[in-house]
Amino acid sequence: MKRIAFVFSTAPHGTAAGREGLDALLATSALTDDLAVFFIADGVFQLLSGQKPDAVLARDYIATFKLLSLYDIEQCWVCAASLRERGLDPQTPFVVEATPLEADALRRELANYDVILRF
């Protein structure tokens, strides 16, 4: 079976991309165990707890990321450079345990996947 990478690169709640990506990720996990999740660029904001999406009339789907371990999704990576550029500390308690990687290491890891879906 092909290895599938899900890349979250957009901020939450501005569009439906993050919610749709999470739905696709959970659905795909029923079909294969060989997948990983990458958070890059503004997608690192998907990892922050304490968001208030109801203030902008959006659905609170961020807490659903906590279910990844129940779906046996354990390969989660976050771009360390994206965190720094946005003033976030890699030690911040995120809703998902994601391993920080520098951009070059992240690209190498991403190159190991056959299919890359970006949200």
Curated annotation (Swiss-Prot):
Function as written in the Swiss-Prot or TrEMBL entry: Part of a sulfur-relay system required for 2-thiolation of 5-methylaminomethyl-2-thiouridine (mnm(5)s(2)U) at tRNA wobble positions.
Pfam families attached to this UniProt entry: DsrE
Top-level lineage group: Bacteria
Location within or outside the cell: Cytoplasm
Keywords in alphabetical order: Cytoplasm, tRNA processing
Protein name as it appears in the record: Protein TusC
GO cellular component assignments: cytoplasm
Record-linked InterPro entries: DsrEFH-like (IPR027396), Sulphur_relay_DsrE/F-like (IPR003787), Sulphur_relay_TusC (IPR037450), Sulphur_relay_TusC/DsrF (IPR017462)
Gene3D superfamilies: DsrEFH-like (3.40.1260.10)
Family listed: Belongs to the DsrF/TusC family.
Assembly with partners or alone: Heterohexamer, formed by a dimer of trimers. The hexameric TusBCD complex contains 2 copies each of TusB, TusC and TusD. The TusBCD complex interacts with TusE.
Biological process per Gene Ontology, one example term: tRNA processing
Main location: cytoplasm
